[in-house]
A protein has these predicted regions:
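N-terminal secretory/targeting leader peptides
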Residues: 2-8, 13-113, 121-353
Length: 353
């Protein structure tokens, strides 16, 4: 055997070993009908397959096909599936620190979230925290600033929240609880029937595109803005940590690249689809309403109280919150000079025609 042939024979098993054939499962918190959220999962799995010449296959499952939508973290943590796609504020019952990595009232917007994770402390902090749950988390989508929810009565002042039963995700329910609202955590696909039957009085989900798909305009009249509890909602790819550590470095790099691509695509899709959906909702009779200044101020006060109370008893929460708040404060120095002043002028110019 010649030297070249011998080298090829030796190298072939090594290449095969570094690029093994794998079949993983990914369970999502979303129904397939929400094609932007679930679409991020499909984009991710397709990217991984194509980048590995089909050797690394990831099958995607919608909420309820393997586990309910709110049990994705459990399924990944205990190894029922290798991966999941979810919003971490669903898991505040385990530890409210999870919400800080997703969306909290008066927190970071979309670009600030991406910057905090990718160019500041965010990824390091979530690596430390998620490891205690046997998981690894990567950015994989952001909805942008969300809407403030669907109501069958007007919310003119803070007292109008009192006694309302509202489907609202994450830490916002804790905040509005201080104003007398009764928060309900319900998966996206179950919100419409709950509104229709009167099990809940109000609901928030994402924004115009997804809310239109779920039909909320048929069972609620008033659509409020902004969703101050979700200025930029980060969804994450959640990976079983031992499985992640077993992956070849090349596959880890591909997974990170695929998640990053899906992260950008999800935000772009929402930005492109929401304007048309908002127009259609209004044409169908939806009445847009802004939250009043008094409502916003009362909610900010309640949010600050929740953060102070939680930080006093939860060191992990305090550590992550302090990092996020310091980053946000510096960011808004810059945004006030550049982004905000530019966008404000352009919005006024548009109104003038």
């Amino acid at each position: 055997m010649g030297a070249g042939a011998a080298a090829t024979a030796i190298a072939a098993p090594a290449i095969a070993q570094s690029s093994p054939a794998l079949k993983w499962r990914l369970t999502a918190s979303w129904p397939k009908s929400l094609d932007t959220l679930f679409g991020a999962c499909e984009t991710f799995s397709k990217f991984v397959s194509e980048a590995t010449d089909g050797k690394f296959q990831i099958q995607t499952f919608a909420a309820g096909e393997i586990v309910p939508g709110l049990q994705v973290l459990d399924a990944v943590q205990n190894g029922t599936v290798e991966m999941g796609h979810s919003a971490q504020y669903y898991y505040i019952g385990k530890d409210p620190t999870w919400a800080l990595f997703c969306a909290v009232p008066f927190g970071l917007n979309t670009r600030q979230q991406n910057a905090w994770f990718q160019a500041a402390d965010g990824q390091k902090l979530i690596d430390e925290f998620a490891a205690t749950y046997n998981t690894k988390c990567l950015l994989m989508g952001n909805t942008g600033c969300q809407m403030g929810g669907w109501f069958n009565k007007e919310i003119k002042e803070p007292g109008d929240f009192r006694g309302l039963k509202m489907r609202i995700g994450g830490w916002a329910g804790k905040t509005l609880g201080k104003l007398g609202l009764v928060a309900q955590q319900i998966a996206g696909g179950d919100i419409y029937p709950a509104l229709e039957k009167g099990t809940i009085d109000a609901a928030e989900w994402v924004g115009p595109y997804d809310d239109e798909k779920l039909g909320f305009y048929k069972v609620a009249k008033y659509y409020y803005y902004p969703g101050w509890w979700e200025g930029g909602t980060t969804n994450h790819l959640i990976i079983n940590l031992p499985k992640w550590n077993e992956l070849p470095k090349s596959y880890q790099a591909i997974v990170q690249a695929a998640a990053g691509y899906a992260n950008v695509e999800e935000t772009a899709a929402y930005d492109a689809r929401n304007p048309g959906a908002l127009k259609r909702l209004v044409a169908n009779g939806t009445q847009l309403r802004p939250f009043s200044q008094s409502v916003m101020e009362a909610c900010l006060k309640a949010s600050n109280e929740v953060n102070a109370e939680t930080s006093a008893t939860n060191p992990a929460y305090k550590k992550v919150l302090e990092s996020m708040e310091a980053f946000k404060n510096d960011e808004y120095l810059w945004w006030q000079v550049a982004e905000y002043s530019f966008d404000s002028f352009m919005i006024r110019a548009r109104a003038r025609g």
